[in-house]
Each structure stands twice: as structure tokens, then as C-alpha cells.
């Protein structure tokens, strides 16, 4: 399947995710019988003013009418702009590119625009912009050597088209729809359109984004901000609470969106009780969406629950665990960035997507999963019931051995 065969003018086309006929019937544009032509799906934006106006309308921005001076740097620096707006975990898992660009280009000046500036590593990125009208105006007023967009949202694609750069990688807006800056992004574009093609993918996410930037992935690590003072504070506190036992961070949820990834409550309770009998220190973790559930687990098991925290403090607490058990979530990316031993629950995604750097194990239902990228289970009984407590325990034992062999 080639990008030229995609029916961007179809009523069912959803921008960058699978359409209903593909989700339901594995329909594919070049042989689809559900195609309904709709010219309104195509939006030609052929100049800078139309692109900028569309971004502002999509994001409900107001034009400040303010002009900004471009960034002036020594010619010895390669000026690189990264557009990665997405979820916090997505931003974190883009950071390995920093190391690669520095190794290939030497002195680099990085700018990064995102919804989540708090996780962009400030000691490695020179200018961090929070996505708003002012930031869009600033980055579009500057000239870059390289600009990269790894998001498929319309506004991100339009921004890359608007940016002035000698080289562009990733996704942009061209011919009235999402498109690719170079052919290397086509694989990632097509797997996003069609579930049945995505299921056949054997590349992990880092291989994909490195390929988009015309690199090979060679194990470059995540980068993350750690507040050393906060981390030291929690080191002392958790050290006292745990009495120097192996600390297992149990991230029990995955936000409000993906309920299909949840492991059954009775399994969590059983796991915690057994771990505590085996002299592990269980630390319940999560965000506001998991607060009520974690209080329930605390009351049922006596496990430690410290409450909910801002992201900076949550990262500091996570930094003082030894092993982290979690579904696919932001916590997975934090654990990888902190180089923790990781046990990852997996069901609804492509298992090849995940790079654990030889520091973790992936556990999935032996019965498989019928809900590819789905947030509603298709079965009477969720496949997550088929991941046994004993399987999880066995993997934790393996991870504990890894700790001892470090």
C-alpha cells in the first residue's frame, strides 16, 4: 500500500488514524468498496498566511500581531527544531534523537515545541516552547537547518509546512492533507491509517522515528529531567519506609481512556499480598485517575500509597524504586528513562512497538487480544484476566535477579 493510493477525499477518512471500514472490515483504500467521495476532506493551504490561519483556528488561538526576531547563532551550530506535541510519554520517548543528532552533527542548538515542556530535558534542549500562539509565532519567525515533526495532528503537520528549514523530516501538510516530508516517513504514515498493516509491523517506535530522520537506531537512551533535591528527599523517606527492602512501584492504572489495559483488582490485591510476604516493599503509584483505586488497594493490603503528585515529584519518587510494574502508560516511559527494571503489561498494541533496552519483560494474555488499539473490550471477559498473578510473580523474580547482577 502506497500513500498515493490513500483516498484522502473519502468521507470515512479520519486524518491520521484508521477509518471505520478499516477498523471493522480491514478495508484498504486501493480495493475498498466503502469509498464515498467528499471534497470537503481536502484543504489546500498554499501559502504561509493560510497555514498560520488554519493552525490558529484549529487551536482556538488569537493572533497577537506581535513580531519576533529570528534566533541568531554561530554558523558552527546546527539549528534543529523538534515538533512533538503529543502525550507526555510520547515526548519522553522522542528524546533519544537528541543523542543521535549530536553524534551526527556535532554542535547542535535544539528548539522543541510541545504540550508537555516539563519533560523536555532542559540541560540538552536550548529552547523549549509550550504550544500556544506566541510559541508558534516565535518558531515560524526563525530559520532552521533541520525541522522534524513526529506528530500526525493537523496543526503539527501544518506547522512543519510553515517552518523555514533546509531539511524537513516527518509529517507535513501538502496537497490538502497530511503528507510526508521524505519517503522515510511513509511507513509510519501507512501503519497509522490501516490496523491490519500496523499489526504486521516489526519495527519498534524508536527504529521508526530514527528511520524518519534518516538514521539507524543503535540503543540511544531516553533523556529526562530529574530534580536532584526532590529525588534525594524521597530517597531518604522511601528508604525509611521500606527499611531497605527491594522497592516495587506498582502503577495500577493507565489513565481514564484505555480501560482495556487494566489488570483485574483481585489480581492486584493477590499480587501485593504475596509480594509483601516475600519481603518486597510495595509502593502504589498513579495519577489522579488512579487515586481512588490506589486507596482501595492500600486499605485492602496495607501497601504504601503516598498520594498524587505533580509530574516533577512523581518522577523523583519513581527514581527511588527498584522495579516498576505497569501497563503501557506514561509510567513505562518514565521507568525506561530512569533505567529501572520494568515489567510491562501488554495487550491492545503491537508488541514489537516497545524497546525496553534489555531492562524489562513484556507480559501479555496467552489468549491474545481482540481489541487492537481499542478502548472498549470486545469479549465478555477481558483478556487481561488471562495474565495470571503467578506469571507476574515469576517475572518479578527475574527482574530482581537482574538487580543483583548489576
What spans do the regions from the language model cover?
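Catalytic machinery of carbohydrate-active enzymes
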Residues: 1-406
Amino acid at each position: 500500500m502506497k500513500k498515493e493510493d490513500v483516498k484522502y477525499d473519502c468521507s470515512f477518512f479520519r486524518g491520521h488514524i484508521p477509518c471505520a471500514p478499516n477498523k471493522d472490515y480491514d478495508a484498504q483504500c486501493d480495493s475498498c468498496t466503502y469509498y464515498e467521495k467528499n471534497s470537503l476532506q481536502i484543504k489546500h493551504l498554499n501559502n504561509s498566511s493560510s497555514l498560520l490561519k488554519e493552525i490558529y483556528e484549529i487551536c482556538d488561538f488569537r493572533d497577537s500581531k506581535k513580531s519576533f526576531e529570528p534566533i541568531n547563532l554561530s554558523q558552527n551550530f546546527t539549528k534543529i527544531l523538534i515538533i512533538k506535541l503529543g502525550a507526555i510519554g510520547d515526548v519522553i520517548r522522542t528524546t533519544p534523537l537528541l543523542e543521535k543528532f549530536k553524534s551526527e552533527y556535532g554542535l547542535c542548538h535544539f528548539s522543541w515545541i510541545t504540550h508537555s515542556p516539563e519533560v523536555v530535558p532542559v540541560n540538552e534542549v536550548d529552547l523549549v516552547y509550550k504550544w500556544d500562539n506566541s510559541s508558534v509565532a516565535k518558531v515560524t519567525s526563525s530559520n532552521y537547518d533541520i525541522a522534524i515533526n513526529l506528530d500526525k495532528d493537523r496543526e503539527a503537520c501544518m506547522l512543519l509546512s510553515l517552518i523555514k528549514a533546509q531539511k524537513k523530516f516527518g509529517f507535513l501538510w501538502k496537497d490538502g492533507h497530511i503528507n510526508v516530508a521524505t519517503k522515510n516517513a511513509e511507513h509510519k504514515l501507512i501503519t497509522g491509517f490501516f490496523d491490519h498493516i500496523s499489526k504486521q509491523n516489526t519495527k519498534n517506535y524508536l527504529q521508526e522515528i530514527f528511520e524518519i530522520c534518516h538514521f539507524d537506531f543503535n540503543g540511544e537512551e531516553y533523556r529526562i529531567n530529574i530534580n536532584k533535591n526532590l529525588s534525594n528527599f524521597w530517597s531518604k523517606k522511601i528508604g525509611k519506609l521500606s527499611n531497605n527492602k527491594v522497592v516495587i512501584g506498582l502503577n495500577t492504572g493507565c489513565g481514564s481512556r484505555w480501560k482495556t489495559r487494566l489488570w483485574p483488582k483481585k489480581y492486584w490485591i493477590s499480587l501485593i499480598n504475596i509480594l509483601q510476604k516475600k519481603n518486597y516493599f510495595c509502593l502504589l503509584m498513579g495519577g489522579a485517575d488512579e487515586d481512588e483505586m490506589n486507596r482501595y488497594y492500600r486499605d485492602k493490603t496495607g501497601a504504601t500509597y503516598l498520594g498524587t503528585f505533580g509530574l516533577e515529584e512523581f518522577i523523583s519518587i519513581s527514581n527511588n524504586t527498584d522495579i516498576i510494574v505497569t501497563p503501557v502508560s506514561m509510567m513505562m516511559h518514565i521507568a525506561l528513562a530512569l533505567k529501572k527494571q520494568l515489567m510491562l503489561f501488554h495487550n491492545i498494541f503491537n508488541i514489537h512497538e516497545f524497546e525496553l533496552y534489555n531492562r524489562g519483560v513484556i507480559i501479555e494474555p496467552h489468549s491474545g487480544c481482540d481489541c487492537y488499539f481499542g478502548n472498549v473490550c470486545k469479549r465478555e471477559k477481558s483478556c487481561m484476566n488471562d495474565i495470571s498473578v503467578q506469571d507476574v510473580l515469576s517475572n518479578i523474580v527475574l527482574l530482581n535477579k537482574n538487580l543483583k547482577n548489576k
